[in-house]
């Protein structure tokens, strides 16, 4: 085990899997700066898939990492996730910090060891979004019965192991509500950070709408593509993933797809967009804040984290309109209250009649800076006993 920095406890970091550098991994990267000597435990690791900063830590993997195709098809091993996370040996550590959207919060620690779990979401594919990940008719019997059995077993495990962390941090009030509903536990809300200094409001022409993110079912990018089939407006789509072929088939003629873009290129794309489309119900959502930091308004579904970012500071009247299924202008752009393609199209048409000041939008992203995150999460770590005061 690596040596400790004086004044710091021997800390283990735990993350579900290290197969790409997405929002959760950026939070992990920021958290890891508090614990430069910590070992990093995970179910599966693809070398080179995450930042050099994370890979400077000693990375320890579960038995899943030795299975064929685990680095690319780890989701096939969903029934084994609980056993894999519980197999990680954390007996030699004084404190544990997990960043969890699946099973990381369920690691087993020694009695009395403080464990802070930063929770991005309870397992969405066995709770709220099971119907989207495993829709009726996707599998024939007996596979369908087996899938339901696995999901039910994972729900029981997920709730039972919610008592393992000594402190739970939710990344939004929306996630905190779901933690309370599914796990019966309270949490402290600390919003994730956005590297706002990477983005500046664009001063040039804004000529296209932007749709960006992982091509996953719960993102509902399909709704925006269907909406734009009836809108004569330019659309740029950035990202990739499991739904790539389906989304290409849905896209209207003239849609521009881009993949593998760098952080610098994405910042330029944000700055040239008329608006970012955000049709999914997200636990928090970093991309809307990145867009706003670029002076770009957001057209978002008015549920989940978008209400706390795009809708931050909105009037009660506007939020009530969205809650009732309508469309309303809010400080960060537009919110629509029905998750349908027609609602996206209506919101875009309403947006076309509005104007937004890029610098005002950029100022709305400033409270989500890294410095704010550092101060708030440090206070949690110190109170929980995973970080000594002043260390």
Language-model features: locations:
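Acidic donor-binding loop of glycosyltransferase active sites
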Residues: 271-283, 296-297
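Active-site donor-binding segments of glycosyltransferases and PAPS-dependent sulfotransferases
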Residues: 34-105
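A charged, aromatic-enriched C-terminal amphipathic alpha-helix characteristic of glycosyltransferases
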Residues: 339-342, 346-382
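Conserved acidic donor-binding segment of nucleotide-sugar-dependent glycosyltransferases
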Residues: 312-341, 350-355
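Short hydrophobic beta-strand element within catalytic cores of glycosyltransferases
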Residues: 297-301, 307-310, 317-319
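Nucleotide-activated donor-binding/catalytic signature segment of Leloir-type glycosyltransferases, i.e.
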Residues: 245-267
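Membrane-proximal helix-turn-helix segments that form the acceptor-binding/catalytic region
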Residues: 135-168, 176
């Amino acid at each position: 085990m690596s040596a400790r920095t004086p004044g710091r406890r021997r800390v283990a970091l735990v993350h579900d899997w290290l197969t790409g550098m997405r929002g959760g991994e950026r939070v992990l990267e920021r958290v890891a700066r508090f614990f430069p000597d910590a070992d990093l435990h995970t179910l599966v690791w693809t070398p080179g898939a995450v930042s050099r900063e994370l890979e400077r830590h000693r990375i320890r993997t579960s038995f899943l990492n030795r299975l064929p195709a685990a680095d690319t098809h780890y989701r096939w091993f969903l029934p084994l996730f609980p056993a894999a996370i519980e197999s990680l040996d954390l007996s030699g550590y004084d404190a544990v910090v997990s960043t969890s959207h699946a099973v990381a919060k369920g690691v087993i620690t020694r009695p009395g060891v403080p464990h802070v779990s930063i929770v991005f979401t309870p397992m969405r594919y066995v709770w709220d979004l099971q119907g989207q990940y495993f829709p009726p008719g996707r599998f024939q019997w007996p596979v369908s019965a087996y899938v339901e059995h696995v999901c039910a077993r994972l729900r029981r495990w997920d709730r039972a192991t919610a008592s393992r962390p000594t402190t739970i941090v939710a990344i939004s009030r929306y996630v905190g509500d779901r933690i309370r509903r599914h796990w019966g536990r309270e949490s402290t809300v600390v919003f994730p950070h956005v590297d706002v200094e990477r983005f500046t409001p664009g001063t040039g022409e804004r000529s296209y709408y932007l749709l960006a993110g992982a091509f996953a079912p719960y993102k509902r990018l399909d709704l925006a593509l269907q909406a734009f089939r009836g809108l004569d407006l330019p659309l740029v789509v950035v990202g990739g993933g499991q739904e790539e072929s389906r989304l290409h088939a849905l896209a209207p003629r003239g849609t521009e797809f881009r993949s593998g873009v760098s952080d610098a290129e994405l910042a330029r794309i944000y700055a040239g967009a008329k608006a970012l489309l955000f049709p999914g119900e997200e636990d928090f959502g970093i991309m809307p804040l990145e867009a706003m930091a670029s002076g770009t308004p957001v057209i978002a579904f008015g549920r989940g984290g978008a209400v706390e970012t795009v809708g931050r500071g909105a009037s009660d009247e506007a939020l009530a309109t969205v809650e009732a299924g309508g469309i309303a202008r809010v400080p960060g752009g537009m919110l629509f209250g029905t998750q349908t393609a027609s609602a996206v199209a209506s919101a875009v048409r309403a947006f076309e009649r509005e104007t937004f000041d890029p610098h005002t939008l950029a100022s709305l992203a400033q409270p989500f800076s890294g410095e704010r995150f550092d101060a708030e999460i440090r206070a949690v770590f110190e109170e929980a006993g995973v970080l000594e005061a002043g260390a």
